[in-house]
Swiss-Prot record:
Tissue expression per record: Widely expressed.
Name of the featured protein: Bifunctional methylenetetrahydrofolate dehydrogenase/cyclohydrolase 2, mitochondrial
Amino acids binding substrate: 89-93, 136-138, 314-318
Taxonomic source organism: Rattus norvegicus (Rat)
Gene Ontology CC annotation, any one: mitochondrial inner membrane
Family matches, as HAMAP family: THF_DHG_CYH
Cofactor: Mg(2+)
One Gene Ontology molecular-function label: methylenetetrahydrofolate dehydrogenase (NAD+) activity
Family per similarity comment: Belongs to the tetrahydrofolate dehydrogenase/cyclohydrolase family.
Lineage start: Eukaryota, Metazoa, Chordata, Craniata, Vertebrata
Subcellular location: Mitochondrion inner membrane
Main location: mitochondrion
Amino acid sequence: MATRARGLSLLRGRLGRGPARAPGVAERAWRGFGSSSRRHEAVIISGTEMAKQIRRELQQGVESWLALGNRRPHLSIILVGDNPASHTYVRNKIRAASAVGICSELIVKPKNVSQEELLDITDQLNMDPRVSGILVQLPLPDHVDERTICNGIAPEKDVDGFHIINIGRLCLDQHSLIPATASAVWEIIKRAGIETFGKNVVVAGRSKNVGMPIAMLLHTDGEHERPGGDATVTIAHRHTPREQLKAHTQLAEIIIVAAGIPGLITADMVREGATVIDVGINYVQDPVTGKTKLVGDVDFEAVKKKASFITPVPGGVGPMTVAMLLKNTLLAAKNITY
């Protein structure tokens, strides 16, 4: 009975306080990656600075891998069409890969390329021993089924983490190549020392590549093969009435927004001291300059006055997504995920 009572006592303590951790972990993380001009404003988490640290770690990892006599990690990127944003994203990925010692190649196809030709390309890359990771830049033209193409990539080379097997393993809390944006959000939370155990989390957005994987990472068991966040997660989407969304976000300690709606989350929807992670990517016209600018889904200037942590757009989740893609490429080269 004494053993059982002690076990129950420990469980109550864990449920009440979350797992113990060394004092000052969060504070050190704030100083390393965040800034706040005034004490009553949120710490702005710099994804740019955090990504720099991860790239340094990856560079060391690549050098250690090569020192053991292994082949240099190689990333093959397939780009379809002439979408300017896609070309910019791909250039950034190639530049970042080169900086950490990962070699890459770009395969460009016109927007009228057939689905069959794309599948032939992925088949060839799957069988190529020099290729560690394969990425198909999305979106694809309407006549090409994205799910079919993503599933055409070998799971062990699927550095975007979109293959049905990788998504399935993620849902089962098993090791897999995790979608890069979801992995970026999870890494930001961990490196900033933000507690998730038993916390209320709202994920606004249910896309299969971003919102759903984020929710899976945050709600799953922290003691499983692939540890999760042990949070209580509510998923909202475009059909969630605004007042209902507001009711959920006002209760949430962590709000993650990946809906693609500028200004979706306003200050009145956020509780004091919440963590707000903005995954949104929206191009809008600046009313003052008339120029196009990049914004997220959060009213940043207003919300930062209530939150404890907030990520900016640009300079938040975006740089971290590229860093986690490179991390997946190194994992794929080592072939240790499965």
